[in-house]
């Protein structure tokens, strides 16, 4: 099979020919470079109009020259309009800049009609994921997409790519560009930040993680202020990378923990950054997870990934009629019907428990519901031990939770975060309990070693026992916390324990607040974890709202809609 791919969502006018016979991809690209500032949509669209015919022509010339090497192609007749052996035309249908997408759509329709072959509409962000899966050979990885206008975590479950976490304001590349424009550097800003960061030292900047979501607006404002106040640009660039990429690596680890998978791929143009790659690789090594990064030519915007995914969709019968091929600037990856993966393994596999082997100290995996052994989450190792094994005389089974130092993070930043979160967990766990929410008793806290001893509660994580009754109760509990001015910060299905009661645990990201926005964000984090991993999330999402409104302020539910609309391309 041979596929002509066409890309042009923002800045790269690109065409490619993918031949599945030898798994070869030929790419021709012509990037748009603004004279000043960032990308100007009208100018970018004009560039697409001028550059796309040339890159398409170059790719078709290559296809014609190599058509004899292709097998099972549409035709090898040199007198045919399709003397290039092309079986279909795949194009970026969205998301992206509307003027650019419309130009690409027009070019793709014209090419499909001229070649007399079917048309395939491809989601640009899913293509970033699929090229990573294609090159790595992974079965069902989590994908961290870090690109100009986007930053999110995706995983496959029941016929869709679910959004596990995402930016709540701007894409990571655009965030870096905003800073570099502020100090007078030309587009693109990311490579310039990376170069300057080699000589920098750490300064304090905001670090914002909420569940598996994150925000860049605060850190960008702080970075601009630091530049205006005369802070060394090298130090700001270094600190931007340490904080932003630390946030992305942390949420990627949280996604691995939530789903139980042990495979991670990186996508998007910002993924070319060596520091980000190093952080993710270190994190995966510490977890025993596999990590893969596609070739650089597949990380930046390119038509090769469009052609590769187009081939999968074409083989699955996912073509689109010319009349139905309208582009969509807000095309979310979780809207795509993933027919080419029907019946394949879900990313949600359940979290295992490590147990020491008496023979050699190696680890084996038990079911997540087993209450004995050592369980590793995103931040900590948790040992469930008998009272006699504790350093203190305790009345019941004990949980020893030790927050691990993260080698991927800057040591100073890591020390600050682990200490603050250990203290916050101890304080908020007790305060939530005082507000009437079932939480473990805290028996001891040691900030220096980042270790807590807590009461063991429940029989399993909510993730293993999802029911509407349990989720309704979680809604009740969050409302009770909010009524007391407390925010959980990370109420995912892994941070709720169920048994004779429903318990909230792991308050490390918690804080005090009287703001309705923070309460709505708590609900969003819970709902997102349900939507990402449940087979039938709709009744569970309703249960969250029902449980919350029975106890809490209905204005929080109203604000929730606003919060969820902030996700990219909602």
PLM regions with names:
Residues 2-95, 102:
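N-terminal beta-alpha supersecondary unit
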Residues 122, 281-306, 319-323:
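Conserved phosphate-binding/catalytic loops in two-lobed NTP-binding clefts
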Residues 117-142:
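Conserved phosphate-binding catalytic cores of ATP/NTP-utilizing and phosphoryl-transfer enzymes
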Residues 5-8, 144-146, 153-231, 317-329, ...:
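A short helix-loop
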Residues 418-422, 437-474:
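Conserved structural core of kinase catalytic domains
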Residues 369-423:
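ATP-binding glycine-rich loop module of kinase domains
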Residues 507-570:
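C-lobe/activation-segment region of protein kinase-like
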Residues 24, 68-81, 195-264, 275-285, ...:
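A contiguous, well-structured pocket-lining segment that forms one wall/lid of small-molecule binding clefts
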């Amino acid at each position: 099979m041979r596929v002509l791919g066409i890309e042009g969502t923002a800045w790269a006018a690109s065409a490619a020919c993918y031949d599945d016979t030898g798994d070869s991809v030929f790419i021709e690209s012509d990037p748009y470079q603004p004279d000043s500032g960032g990308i100007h949509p009208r100018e970018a669209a004009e560039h697409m109009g001028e550059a796309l015919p040339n890159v398409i022509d170059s790719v078709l010339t290559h296809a014609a020259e190599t058509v004899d090497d292709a097998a099972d192609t549409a035709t090898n007749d040199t007198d045919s309009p399709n003397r290039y052996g092309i079986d279909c035309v795949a194009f970026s249908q969205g998301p992206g800049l509307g003027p650019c997408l419309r130009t690409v759509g027009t070019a793709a329709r014209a090419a499909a009609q001229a070649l007399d072959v079917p048309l395939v509409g491809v989601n640009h962000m899913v293509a970033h994921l699929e090229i990573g899966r294609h090159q790595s050979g992974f079965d069902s990885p989590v994908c961290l997409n870090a690109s100009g206008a986007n930053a999110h975590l995706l995983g496959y479950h029941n016929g869709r790519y679910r959004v596990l976490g995402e930016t709540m304001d701007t894409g990571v590349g655009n965030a870096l560009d905003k800073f570099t424009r502020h100090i007078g550097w030309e587009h693109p800003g990311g490579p310039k930040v990376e170069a300057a960061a080699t000589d920098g030292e750490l300064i304090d900047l905001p670090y914002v993680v909420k569940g598996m979501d994150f925000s860049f607006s605060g850190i960008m404002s702080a970075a601009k202020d630091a530049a205006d106040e005369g802070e060394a640009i090298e130090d700001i660039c270094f600190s931007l990378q340490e904080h932003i990429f630390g946030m992305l690596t942390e949420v990627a680890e949280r996604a691995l923990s939530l789903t139980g998978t042990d495979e991670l791929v990186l996508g998007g143009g910002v993924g070319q950054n060596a520091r980000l790659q190093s952080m993710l690789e270190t994190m995966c090594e510490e977890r025993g997870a596999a990590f893969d990064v596609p070739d650089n030519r597949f990380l930046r915007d390119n038509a090769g990934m469009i052609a590769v995914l187009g081939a999968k969709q074409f083989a699955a019968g996912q073509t689109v009629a010319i009349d139905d091929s309208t582009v969509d600037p807000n095309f979310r990856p979780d809207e795509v019907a993933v027919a080419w993966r029907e019946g394949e393994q879900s990313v949600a596999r359940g979290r295992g428990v490590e147990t020491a082997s008496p023979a050699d100290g190696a680890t084996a995996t038990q079911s997540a519901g087993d209450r004995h052994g050592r369980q590793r989450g995103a931040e900590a190792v948790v040992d469930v031990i008998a009272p006699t094994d504790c350093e203190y005389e305790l009345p019941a089974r004990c949980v020893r939770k030790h927050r691990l130092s993260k080698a991927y993070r800057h040591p100073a930043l890591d020390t600050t975060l682990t200490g603050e979160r250990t203290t916050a967990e101890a304080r908020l766990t007790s305060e939530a309990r005082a507000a009437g929410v079932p939480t473990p008793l805290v028996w001891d806290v040691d900030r220096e070693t980042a270790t807590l001893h807590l009461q063991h509660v429940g029989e399993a994580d909510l993730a293993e026992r999802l029911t509407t009754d349990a989720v309704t109760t979680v809604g009740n509990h969050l409302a009770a916390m909010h009524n007391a001015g407390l925010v959980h910060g990370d109420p995912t299905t892994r941070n709720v324990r169920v048994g004779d009661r429903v318990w909230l645990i792991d308050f490390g990201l918690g804080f005090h607040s009287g703001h309705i926005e923070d309460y709505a964000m708590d609900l969003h984090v819970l709902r997102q974890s349900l939507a990402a991993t449940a087979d039938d999330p709709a009744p569970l999402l309703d249960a969250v709202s029902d449980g919350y409104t029975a106890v809490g302020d209905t204005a929080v539910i109203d604000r929730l809609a606003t919060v969820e609309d902030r996700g990219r391309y909602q």
